[in-house]
Curated annotation (Swiss-Prot):
The keyword NAD does not apply. It comes from the Bacteria. Coiled coil: none annotated. Catalyzes the phosphorylation of D-fructose 6-phosphate to fructose 1,6-bisphosphate by ATP, the first committing step of glycolysis. This is ATP-dependent 6-phosphofructokinase. Its main location: cytoplasm. InterPro entries: ATP_PFK (IPR022953), ATP_PFK_prok-type (IPR012003), PFKA_ATP_prok (IPR012828), Phosphofructokinase_CS (IPR015912), Phosphofructokinase_dom (IPR000023), PKF_sf (IPR035966). Allosterically activated by ADP and other diphosphonucleosides, and allosterically inhibited by phosphoenolpyruvate. Its EC number is 2.7.1.11. The active site is at D127. Mg(2+) binds at D103. SUPFAM superfamilies: Phosphofructokinase. The keyword Cytoplasm applies.
Length: 319
């Protein structure tokens, strides 16, 4: 294999640039040319493709976002869109592709593989919801962003003796809510993977208030429901002054943590190795601090599950 491509797709996550850097430098080290595909699968279909040199990925390891940009591309879900993408890859002499993104990006890589084009998926999403890996690129950075916000919110919650509801990202996966809530000492954590009893939440808040606790932090994953609605229900049921903070897209930005930079570097380099070994249709991940790879179709057939032990611990510690 003499020429490979790399693209980022779907929602951006801190550390994607570090992964791009690793792909480019690892490939060039082995005498392989690398072409960057801009704006994800949409850019692939449009032929927005450019050769990348070592200098093109200099001074990006610390930057959030993605220098290749990213976009959603409904057209690539169609057979016609996939064939257009393969035509562009062949036109540029690209023999293998590294796809950095979430489950939707993996679906695109799987389709290309089914058409006979070798692809390797690299997990890049703040949601940490990709099967086959303990952590995804960007999760740790997003987690630290949320923790920083929780710490600041707790300061003002304490000063004003208020209850705060903090809504975080996670439509289908509660990892951000669970990990940040546990690390931030939240009184209640609501995640999509677990049922909750609003009456029980209200009762626990009242019990805490009766024993002298004048402020509380509640973390709500967006997939559970609107933080604004939860805040309204809590204030109406308890009479406690309640405020709501929706963190939103700030969770996707910022300079990646050291953990995410190292993880992205390891995963990006391994993705190149797999292509050079002639192994397409794979996705890389980290499990027990070891870099692993799986069949991408098998990984997509599985469902990410939140760590129930951590969820149980969070409830035990929030009495």
């Amino acid at each position: 294999m003499k020429r490979i491509g790399v693209l980022t797709s779907g929602g951006d996550s801190p550390g994607m640039n570090a992964a791009i850097r690793a792909v480019v430098r690892k490939a060039i080290y082995h005498g392989v040319e690398v072409y960057g595909i801009y704006h994800g699968y949409a850019g692939l279909i449009a032929g927005n493709i450019k050769k990348l040199e070592v200098g093109d990925v200099g001074d990006i390891i610390h930057r959030g976002g993605t220098i290749l940009y990213t976009a959603r591309c409904p057209e690539f879900k169609t057979e016609e869109g996939q064939k257009k993408g393969i035509e562009q890859l062949k036109k540029h002499g690209i023999e293998g592709l590294v796809v950095i993104g979430g489950d939707g990006s993996y679906q695109g890589a799987k389709k290309l593989t089914e058409h006979g084009f070798p692809c390797v998926g690299v997990p890049g999403t703040i949601d940490n919801d990709i099967p086959g890996t303990d952590f995804t690129i960007g999760f740790d950075t997003a987690l630290n962003t949320v923790i920083d916000a929780i710490d600041k919110i707790r300061d003002t919650a304490t000063s004003h003796e208020r209850t705060y509801v903090v809504e975080v990202m996670g439509r289908h996966a509660g990892d951000i809510a669970l990990w940040s809530g546990l690390a931030g000492g939240a009184e209640t954590i609501l995640i999509p993977e677990a049922d909750y009893d609003m009456d029980d939440i209200i009762a626990r808040l009242k019990r805490g208030h009766e024993r002298g606790k004048k402020h509380s932090i509640i973390i709500v994953a967006e997939g559970v429901g609107s933080g604004v609605d939860f805040g309204r229900q809590i204030q109406e049921a308890t009479g406690f002054e309640t405020r709501v903070t929706v963190l939103g897209h700030v969770q996707r930005g910022g300079s990646p943590t050291a953990f995410d930079r190292v993880l992205a570097s390891r995963l990006g380099a391994r993705a190149v190795e797999l292509l050079l070994e002639g192994k397409g249709g794979r996705c890389v991940g980290i499990q027990n601090n070891q870099i692993v790879d799986h069949d991408i179709a098998e990984a997509l057939a599985k469902t990410h599950t939140v760590d129930q032990r951590m969820y149980t611990l969070s409830k035990e510690l929030s009495i």
